[in-house]
């Protein structure tokens, strides 16, 4: 894990060096100046132009021509924010945001346009009232001796001691369900630390690149990502990971790692994606900009920006709430019972 973290830090340092160059360009704090600053920041540092051109025909030059006609130096900040936010929406990227004091421009279509495939009330029913909590993990043993771990976020890291306790408590179970549905991400190191409990050897899990220049295709060669086994207690039985469209960013990476581990099956819906390491800059008006700067790929060098397919595509049923059962959890239990 230290090797992957070192590579990540080196790449982020390179991105920081490049992004600082944005400040070398002086733009007036006018609607036109802010438009030009934003378009150029994205043009020189965003990492998915080629991929998204192939996926849905994104043409950043055409986007500029279309939106510059909407810029008028008499427009107010609300109007400018709306136009610039709409332009950023053309990237279809949940890691691309613009922050003002009154709003956040965002694109959440990666999960808003799809069924949620999760119910908080049903998850509470499976957890009951006597479940255990270790850092951000909620866990218990279900009636059929299957371990259930609810991991709703990687915003903070579970310590090695926390993970040891979870592994020890569930050790007698015949299988394990890890539910990361609606996990919007957080720390990649937290995702790595958890995934490291499910492999006994160093395994290639993917690749990363960083920008080496201002050209849209100025990238380093692909640098491998490896997952090293934890020195703590490791799980040796079958595992099912549950996913939906709201699995994003570091959680998307977790699913990527787990698909490379033995005895792991992914069940649910395609993940939301978010495979660009985000970085930040600022416009003359003072609004912060976040964007994807370092692309990440799976072990086959394929992009996961628009998500990872499950091994078994399962949706929640329309009558799940009425029956009090979660079709995705129940499918996982059946797999572990085979």
Each language-model region and where it sits:
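Flexible, low-complexity junctional segments that flank or bridge functional domains
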Residues: 20-210, 217-224, 238, 280, ...
